[in-house]
Amino acid sequence: MAVLTYNNYLRQLLSKYECILAFDTAADFLGLTNGGYRSAAQIFVTKKQNIEGTEQIKIDSFEQIECQEYHGLLCTTVNQTIINLLEQDGDEQVIAESLANYYEENGQSFEALEIPEHLKIRFKKYSEWRYLK
């Protein structure tokens, strides 16, 4: 229920702006995390906009980000979200939950994920639990 409420909040806040949900916000919106409190919605923008309650990450072009429309908002794809989380190396709980939930949703497999070579060591760090069976 909390995720649906948060997603509705994001739609109300961002539906009229040019932006892409990013990082922890994208992971929450896509259901990769188990939810949590976020003081600001993280979004990619091509120019800074006056949107209260957001952390805006400026990028040159939306074309450099793999995204899709999802329930009325542009959001990074699942694969792009996981890559971004690993690159950012931010909240370990968000990264671990995102990988664990992805793994379960995909038949206990990471086979479809495309992790760049430079992130494979970090990916292994956060996914070692799968070998502890």
Regions found by a protein language model. Name each.
Residues 39, 59-133:
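Hydrophobic alpha-helical interaction segments
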Residues 1-71, 105-108:
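Short gly/ser-rich loop at a beta-strand->alpha-helix junction or flexible surface loop bordering the NTP-binding
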